[in-house]
Amino acid sequence: MGKDNFVKEITNIEEDFAKWYTDVVRKAELADYTDTKGCIAIRPYGYAIWENIQKYADAKFKEVGVTNLYMPVLIPESMLQKEKDHVEGFAPEVAWVTMGGGEELEERLCIRPTSETMMSTMYAKWVKSWRDLPILGNQWCNVLRWEKETRPFLRSREFLWQEGHTIHETAKEAEERTLMMLDIYADVIENLLAIPVLKGRKTPKEQFAGADSTYTVETLMVDGRALQAGTSHYFGQNFTKPFEIKFQNREGKEEYAYQTSWGISTRLIGAVIMAHGYNRGLKLPPRVAPIQAVLVPIAAHKEGVLEKTSAIYDSLKNKFRMKFDDRDNVSPGFKFNDWEMRGVPVRIEIGPRDLEEGLAVLVRRDTSEKITVKIEDLETEIENLLETIQKDMFNACVERKNNKTTVAYSLEEIEKNLAENQGYVKTMWCGDRACEDKVKEVTGAPSRCMPFEQEHLADTCPICGKKADKMIVWGRQY
């Protein structure tokens, strides 16, 4: 009995969201803690989710001319220090290698927290003429940042990501690329992960160290906290000048190039868990799920059941990412709970009577609804159901985002809305850093972004009363 109940043993989501989250991560076998403090082991099921994200995003990148490359994980200290704002922004998070081969190194090497400096150094060697531009490079790799407080996928010292770095002939072209990649991130998150995004520009306080401007795709979790899901940065010439990325322009004159960078990470796995989470474990959108459907034979010990259901599975396994659960050491109930915990979108149940009548039962992971269909129609029915689940999961998140987005006209109202409703709070903003700091100090909520879709909510800033022409969104974050 204890074994059958094991998959149900997760903390109530309303009682302790953080504990619920780590319970799901471990019991759905997505990741586990290691003896290396602050670093996780991503298990095969969790890594399969990342592979699906990677496959989808990489194809989108290549459609717009991006090519993959790879840079060293070790960066010399002198290289890191070439861009002052950048090194100051990352200094507290950098891990250093000081010994090699039993000897002290002449120069410290940092373990890659991000690769702007290494990419810029190499691009400077490769760019001579405007004909060499643009360079549209991306790498899928690991990075290390010495985080003090860690949580699986959301904030760990070592994590996986992609970082794109591009070099352009003109500022206009670079700015267009920055927004183009942000749109691809929105596509990945909305169409693959079924999570609606809020797109906008970060305030100068919140933008990336060394950037002229940072753009973000923000997401809202089931508990009303925000998660920054991806960012795209326009650097202007902030890196090309110190790193001497120059080219001969069309008039034969030498000038500095323009640069961008953009990235998403395994943090998106955390976003999927928390955006679609509820008390019965993991719930995965079909397009990103490692297993889209599982076939569980009922009364498999009865004559012909295993053979016939196995044949049905064989007819479907090349159409969908599927599993056939023919384990004989656990009950069907355990199997149901096990696959629910793993978030498999569709369960197919077929027993002896179903086989006699030519029927199968489809069970939706997102709603627990049971649907009886003809076995001969299974392929079409599963295909349609997976699309329905994908859309319904997205729409449920849209509805929650709308319900948890409020408007405030005073600092007290911002505080009240966040206390009562969590979520996003929209206000006008004068643009002053002091007002931004005040909201964070009083409410604990930093600015999320200045949305691309602006609304004129009022004429003045709710914090200082000065004239305001920008709408900004606030929200507590992960």
Q: Which sequence ranges carry the predicted segments?
A:
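NTP/phosphate- and nucleic-acid-binding module
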Residues: M1-Y478
